Structures are given as structure tokens and as C-alpha cells.
């Protein structure tokens, strides 16, 4: 398989009034095309910082990131970044919100708009396209947020705890919905989550981080069936064994 993303010895430090804080230390991993990778770790260990560095929003103190073999700043790969909250503009309709990346790119082509329209139709939001975010459920807003993230046809999706703002039952349903969209569209994805079950139910590989300064403790290849839904993966007898293994790794770090 071809590497879409490679992080090589990424480190991050920042200065406070008192001293220098080391957040990340020698983080190295790669993500293959079409792969779904989850990153888990203790609270405050720098998971979101890793996504921000990949997205080019935060400059690392050391190390190198390459996208399709080229340095991040020189690459032409499109990256979609979905935050914890849906961040839909309340004054815009669902359709207008999903068109936003096209507007940013000044892409006025009917072909691009039609592609977004097809996503809205395929994933059950077409009849709600003229509604405003407040008129939709939390799950539907998250679906709209993912479609907006994919509107510019990104090569790489970054998901920063996209289900954390939802109640447990809605979270399971939305996780299934978003997973189906990502797999159908064959999107290369990096998910950050504090939820072990969420990571296990979606990822091909799981990267386990230590407490700060964060290092990689382990990278696990998850042998659960990726052709079934996240909810079905949770029913696999191996799921609980994986959960216990990962929980012990994280608990050891506390």
C-alpha cells in the first residue's frame, strides 16, 4: 500500500511564564491510503496537537511530516479537518453549510456542487437541505459536518473526537453513519479519541500514546472485521480482549 501520511520524529514544546513544556517527543508513524487509524492516550497528552500539526495549523518544534512523499508545506494534498463540535453556521442552511469549502476554494463549478448534492442525497440529508442546523438532530448535524468536510474531496480526513458532544445512544448511531460514509468513499482517516471502544470499533490500527511528554507506547493492528459496522464489531468476542489490553496500557500510564 502507498503511504499518504508520514510523521518522522515529531516533537512539540511550548513556553509558559515559568518554564518550557514538552508536549510531544519523537512521534513517528505512517498512514496508508484508505486506512483508518485511531490515536488514543491520556487526557492532555497532545492528541489534538498531532492533528493540528498534520493540518498545518501548528508548527512542530522538530521532525518532519510528508504527504505523499513531499514535505507538508510543499504538498498539494487536500486535508479535511472535522472538529469536536459540528461548527455549522446557524444562519446558513444545511446545503449552504456543505457548500462552504467550495466557496473558500472559489470553486463555482456545477460539477463540484453536484458532487456535494450526491453526498446529501446518498446519506439522507437532501430533504433537509433547506433547513437550518437548529432544526436538525445532533446526529444529523454531525453527518452534515462530515459531508462539508468531504466537499473539497480531501485525500486525508482528520477527526478530532467527532462524537464527544453527543449522548451515548446517539454517539453509537452517528459513529455507524460516519463510518459507513468514510468506508464507502474510501477516505484515508486519522481519528483522535479518548474512547477505547470507539477506536476499536472503527480503526484498522490504533496508536497508543503515553502521558506528557507524549511518546508512542504501541501501535496495534486490529484484527476485527472492517466490513461490518462499528456496532457489529463490538459484538466480536475479541473486542473485549482488545479493550482490556488497551485499557491496561493506558491505565499503566496513569
Language-model segment annotations:
Residues 132-136, 140:
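Conserved ABC ATPase signature
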Residues 95-103, 113:
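Short helical segment in ABC ATPase nucleotide-binding domains corresponding to the A-loop/adjacent helical element
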Residues 40-42:
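The feature captures the beta-strand-to-loop junction immediately N-terminal to the Walker
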Residues 110-128, 180:
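Conserved ABC ATPase "signature" region
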Residues 55:
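Helix-to-loop junction immediately C-terminal to a conserved catalytic motif
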Residues 151-155:
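A short, proline-enriched helix->beta-strand linker immediately N-terminal to the Walker B motif
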Residues 63-75:
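Conserved ABC transporter NBD signature motif
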Amino acid at each position: 500500500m502507498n503511504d499518504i501520511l508520514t510523521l518522522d520524529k515529531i516533537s512539540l514544546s511550548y513556553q509558559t511564564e515559568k518554564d518550557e513544556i514538552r508536549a510531544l517527543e519523537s512521534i513517528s508513524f505512517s498512514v496508508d491510503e484508505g486506512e483508518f487509524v485511531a490515536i488514543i492516550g491520556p487526557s492532555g497528552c497532545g492528541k489534538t496537537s498531532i492533528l493540528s500539526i498534520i493540518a498545518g495549523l501548528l508548527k512542530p518544534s522538530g521532525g518532519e511530516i510528508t504527504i505523499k512523499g513531499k514535505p507538508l508545506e510543499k504538498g498539494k494534498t487536500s486535508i479535511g479537518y472535522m472538529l469536536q463540535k459540528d461548527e455549522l453556521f446557524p444562519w446558513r442552511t444545511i446545503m449552504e453549510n456543505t457548500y462552504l469549502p467550495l466557496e473558500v476554494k472559489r470553486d463555482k463549478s456545477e460539477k463540484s456542487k453536484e458532487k456535494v448534492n450526491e453526498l446529501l442525497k446518498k446519506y439522507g440529508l437532501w430533504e433537509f437541505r433547506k433547513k437550518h442546523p437548529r432544526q436538525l438532530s445532533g446526529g444529523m448535524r454531525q453527518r452534515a459536518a462530515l459531508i462539508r468536510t468531504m466537499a473539497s474531496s480531501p485525500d486525508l480526513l482528520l477527526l478530532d473526537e467527532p462524537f464527544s458532544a453527543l449522548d451515548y445512544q446517539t454517539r453509537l448511531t452517528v459513529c455507524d453513519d460516519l463510518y459507513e460514509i468514510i468506508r464507502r468513499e474510501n477516505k484515508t482517516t486519522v481519528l483522535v479519541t479518548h474512547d477505547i471502544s470507539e477506536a476499536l470499533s472503527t480503526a484498522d490500527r490504533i496508536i497508543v500514546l503515553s502521558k506528557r511528554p507524549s511518546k508512542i507506547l504501541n501501535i496495534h493492528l486490529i484484527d476485527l472485521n472492517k466490513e461490518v459496522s462499528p456496532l457489529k464489531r463490538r459484538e466480536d468476542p475479541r473486542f473485549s480482549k482488545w479493550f482490556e489490553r488497551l485499557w491496561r496500557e493506558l491505565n499503566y500510564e496513569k
